[in-house]
Amino acid sequence: MNKKVITVALALVLAGGSYAQNDATKKKVKAYMVSDAHLDTQWNWDIQTTINEYVWNTISQNLFLLKKYPEYIFNFEGGVKYAWMKEYYPEQYEEMKKFIEEGRWHIAGSSWEANDVLVPSVESSIRNIMLGQTYYRQEFGKEGTDIFLPDCFGFGWTLPTIATHCGLIGFSSQKLDWRNHPFYENSKHPFTIGLWKGVDGKQVMLAHGYDYGRRWDSEDLSKNKDLEELAKHTPLNTLYRYYGTGDIGGSPTLGSVRSVELGIKGNGPVEVISATSDQLFKDYLPFNNHPELPVFDGELLMDVHGTGCYTSQAAMKLYNRQNEQLGDAAERAAVAAEWLGTAIYPQHTLTEAWKRFIFHQFHDDLTGTSIPRAYEFSWNDELISLKQFSQALTSSVNAIAGQMDTRVKG
């Protein structure tokens, strides 16, 4: 009898222990740690400073970290900045390509530049992604899968639609926390992780990354209480967390990278993942298999903070719109001329013209929030693109007109 009691008691203890273990595993927080060194192409400095100082800091510092810390993954956005790395720092660029191939230097954002997404036309936004993806495919044999805009001043309802039509699956930003005017009350962002539905009903996964300048000092992040608390804001028990630097490029601090490494090896209640910017989105595909994901159907504007961006530096907005319209007209005429066999399609000229003015749609450039000297470079590039589009349009129309039979009876 006593043996039976002992056996039953032991079974209950073991079952209870197993249940507690399963329950702990079930409740374990998952933290996707997304490193970044967001670099403003122009803001309180001009493009020359960006190329000579900040681009160099970004590539050199992160190559050092990638060699020193085996779990470190770096995310960096903006195809034009990769092009500058290739032009100005070719030796480091070739070294970086090896880490891209290994998946440790991650191409974030899919686009030619981290542009404003409210002032540019839809055509420009799609071109921005197309130009970026083309560059990444040709240079690295890879493409991006997400829209990565940590620092833009609001996001229109068309963005999920544009993203899905370009084959992208996710969107992240930290800027929604700036919607801190009482006007927003408790609706700064609809959720921290969920689905965002566009105007046509197509959806991307949305992740709020929090402050991209977050730092830690060599602590075990698997036991970090802040990460645990932030994860409670989603029904997924999951956190998407930027860390690194903002505006001037560079890299996360040594202490921050060590903290992520310690967290990966730690045994606390947080499962720490050194993540690419799109890993969370890929882990939840297909989205319709996850009914627990909340859905937002609307726009995410910054009505207070970003309002002046729609009118500041009116000349930039004029040049930008002229380029959008002239570029469209030039391409239509050039296609017609080639189809008629009267001219060769000027692909290189048109591509370079689009690239040159589209990167000035950057969220501190076209928006009118940079220093006056920065616009000396911006206006110059806008005018060069206008000239190139104008020449392509004129030559194409002349080629078409030269083949037209305008003879009529007198």
Name each model feature, range by range.
Residues 21-410:
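Catalytic-domain carbohydrate-binding cleft regions of carbohydrate-active enzymes
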Residues 1-5, 21:
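Short, Lys/Arg-enriched, disordered terminal segments
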Residues 4-14:
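Sec-dependent N-terminal signal peptides
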Residues 15-20:
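C-terminal segment of classical bacterial N-terminal signal peptides
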